[in-house]
C-alpha cells in the first residue's frame, strides 16, 4: 500500500511540475513578444494612422486607378 501511495505522490508531483513549467513558459513567451515589439500600443496605433494618411496623400498627388486628381476636378 505504501508503494502505491509513494508512486501516486511521485506521479502527481511530476504532473504538477510539468503543468507549472508549461504555464511559466507560456507567460515568458508572451512577455518576450511584448519586449521584442518594444513599442507601446499608442505608438503602433499612430503608426497605422500615419500609414493611412501617407497612402491618401500619395493618392491625391498621383491619382489612384479610376480616379482623377483633385486639381483636375476643380
Swiss-Prot record:
Its main location: secreted. Disulfide bonds: none annotated. GO terms for cellular component: extracellular region; membrane; other organism cell membrane. Expressed by the venom gland. It is found in: Secreted; Target cell membrane. Coiled coil: none annotated. One of its GO terms (biological process) is defense response to bacterium. Keywords: Amidation, Antibiotic, Antimicrobial, Cleavage on pair of basic residues, Cytolysis, Fungicide, Membrane, Secreted, Signal, Target cell membrane, Target membrane. Residues 1-21 form the signal peptide. Residues 22-33, 69-74 form a propeptide. Transmembrane segments: none annotated. The modification Proline amide is found at residue 65. It comes from the Eukaryota. Possesses antimicrobial activity against both Gram-negative and Gram-positive bacteria, as well as against the fungus C.tropicalis. Also possesses a relatively high hemolytic activity. May act by disrupting the integrity of the bacterial cell membrane. Belongs to the non-disulfide-bridged peptide (NDBP) superfamily. Medium-length antimicrobial peptide (group 3) family. This is Antimicrobial peptide HsAp3. It comes from Heterometrus spinifer.
Amino acid at each position: 500500500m505504501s508503494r502505491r501511495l509513494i508512486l501516486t505522490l511521485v506521479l502527481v508531483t511530476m504532473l504538477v511540475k510539468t503543468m507549472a513549467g508549461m504555464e511559466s513558459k507560456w507567460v515568458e513567451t508572451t512577455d518576450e513578444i511584448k519586449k521584442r515589439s518594444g513599442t507601446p500600443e499608442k505608438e503602433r496605433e499612430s503608426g497605422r494612422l500615419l500609414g493611412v494618411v501617407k497612402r491618401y496623400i500619395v493618392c491625391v498627388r498621383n491619382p489612384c486607378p479610376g480616379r482623377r486628381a483633385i486639381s483636375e476636378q476643380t
